Amino acid sequence: MPADHIPALALAGPTASGKTAAAFAIADALAPRLPVEIISVDSALVYSGMDIGTAKPTPAEQARVPHHLIDIRDPLQAYSAAEFVQDATRLIGEIRARGALPLLVGGTMLYFKALFDGIDDMPPADAAVRARLEAQAAAIGWSGMHAELARVDPPTAARLAPGDSQRIQRALEVWHVSGRPLSSFHTTKTVAASARPMSAASLFSLEPHDRAWLHGRIAERFHAMLAAGFLDEVLRLRARGDLHADLPSMRCVGYRQAWESLDGLYPMSSLPERGIAATRQLAKRQITWLRSMPERHSIACDAPDATAQLVQAVRARVWGGGA
C-alpha cells in the first residue's frame, strides 16, 4: 500500500478496558499485509521508572510490535499536550514512510482531543518560571495561588478548584511567560483542519455496556499491581529525593494515592480502596469524553466477541471490507 494511502488509526478506551490486548489483536490481524507500529497516547507511560503503576507494556510486548512515546521523560520533567501532538505528528509521517500503519493507543483524552481538534499555540513550559511559582506556593499555599489566578485570569480560576495545583501552576505560568491569560488561548485553534494528522473519524473506542464489568477489572488490576510490587516502585521513586507530590508524574492515578499514604496523610490500609476509587473516577471521565465524539466507532469491550468485532471494523476501515 502506498504510504500516502495508509491511514492512521486510533484506539481509545477507559483504563482496564483491554486496549493493550486489542492493539496486539489488530497488529496480528493486519501484519500479513500491513505492519503496525503503536504510538502510545498515555501521559503516564511517557515516564521512565513508572512501570507497574502504569501497566506499561513489557519489554517483550514492546519488542513484538514497535512502540513509541514510552519512557521518553524522566518523572521530574513535564510533557505537554502540545509536545505530544508534535511528536505524534512526526511519528505518523515516519511510520507511514516505512510502509507501516500508525496505531495510536491510549486513554489520555486530552492528547486525543489536541490531535483531532488542533491545539492552541500556548507558550512552552518554562522551568525558571515554574520554580518561582512553586516557591511562591510554598509560602502562601495553593489557595493563595488560586486567588492570584483569579486576579489575572478570572475565567480559568472559576473552573479550577483551589487545590488543583497542577493546573493553577500552568495557568499562572502561561500568564507570566506570555502576558496573556490562559483563557484567551481557548478561543481559537491555530492548526487548520487540513494540517491535522488525523480526525476523530479514525477513532475506535472500547466502551463497556456494563459499568460493573469495568469496575471489577479496575479492582482486579489495582490489586494485581500491588501484588507485583507497586508500592516498592513508589518507594524507589521517593528515594531519589528530587521528586515531590505536585509533579505531573506523581499526580498520576495510583501514584498520587500511594504517595499520600507514604506521607502519612491516609492509612496505608486505605490505599487499595482509594486507588480503586480514583481509577473508577478516571474511567468515568474517559467514557464521558468518548461519548462526546459522535464520529467514533464504538465497540462494547465487555461483549464476548469484542476483539472479533474490533478487528472486523479495522479491516473494513483499512481495506474497505476486504479480509
Swiss-Prot record:
Cofactor: Mg(2+)
Class of the enzyme per the UniProt entry, highest EC level: transferase
Single GO molecular function: tRNA dimethylallyltransferase activity
Residues annotated as site: Interaction with substrate tRNA: 108, 130
Region (Interaction with substrate tRNA): 42-45, 166-170, 251-256, 284-291
Reactions accelerated catalytically: adenosine(37) in tRNA + dimethylallyl diphosphate = N(6)-dimethylallyladenosine(37) in tRNA + diphosphate
Residue sites binding ATP per the record: 13-20
EC number: 2.5.1.75
Stored InterPro entries: Dimethylallyltransferase, IPT, P-loop_NTPase
Residues that hold substrate according to the record: 15-20
Keywords recorded for this protein, A-Z: ATP-binding, Magnesium, Nucleotide-binding, Transferase, tRNA processing
Transmembrane stretches, start-end: none
Cross-referenced SUPFAM superfamilies: P-loop containing nucleoside triphosphate hydrolases (SSF52540)
A GO biological-process term: tRNA modification
HAMAP family to which the protein is assigned, alphabetical: IPP_trans
Role description: Catalyzes the transfer of a dimethylallyl group onto the adenine at position 37 in tRNAs that read codons beginning with uridine, leading to the formation of N6-(dimethylallyl)adenosine (i(6)A).
PANTHER family membership: TRNA DIMETHYLALLYLTRANSFERASE
Family statement drawn from the similarity comment of this UniProt entry: Belongs to the IPP transferase family.
UniProt subunit comment: Monomer.
Name of the protein in its database record: tRNA dimethylallyltransferase
Origin species: Acidovorax ebreus (strain TPSY) (Diaphorobacter sp. (strain TPSY))
Gene behind this protein: miaA
